[in-house]
Amino acid sequence: MSLGSRTFRSKRQMAAFEKSLQGRYLKLLRRNPFLFYGVPFCTLMAVGSYCLSDFTAVKYEREDKKVRSVQEDELVKLRANRRTVDLKEEFYRLQGLADQDWEPVRVPRLPGESENVWDVE
C-alpha cells in the first residue's frame, strides 16, 4: 500500500502542521478549489490581456500608417487630375439622356440555330 504524494505524520506533527501557514493554506484549498484554480487563471488572463495589448496596438498602428500614406498619395493625385465641372453636362449625364441614342438590333442567327420562340396559346 502506497501513500502516494502524502507524507505520514503523527498526531503531534499533524497538529503542528495544521497550525503552520502551509497547513492552513492547504486546508483552505481543500474547502475552496477556486482559490487554487480560479484565482490564478483569472489573474493570468488579466495580466496576459494587458501584456498582449501592446502587440495588438502595434498591429493597428501599422494599419493606420498604411491607410494614412495611401490617403496622402491619393490626395496628391486627386488634386493634380481634377476636371472641370459643367452643371448642364452633369445634369444630362445623370439623367442618362446621352445613352438613349441607340436602337435594339437583333443579332442574326447561325444557320440551323433555333429561334427560341415560345408558342404560348
Swiss-Prot record:
InterPro entries: Cyt_c_Oxase_assmbl_COX16. The chain crosses the membrane at residues 34-56. Signal peptide: none annotated. Pfam families: COX16. GO terms for cellular component: mitochondrial inner membrane. Keywords: Membrane, Mitochondrion, Mitochondrion inner membrane, Transit peptide, Transmembrane, Transmembrane helix. Residues 1-31 form a transit peptide. Required for the assembly of the mitochondrial respiratory chain complex IV (CIV), also known as cytochrome c oxidase. May participate in merging the COX1 and COX2 assembly lines. This is Cytochrome c oxidase assembly protein COX16, mitochondrial. It comes from Eremothecium gossypii (strain ATCC 10895 / CBS 109.51 / FGSC 9923 / NRRL Y-1056).
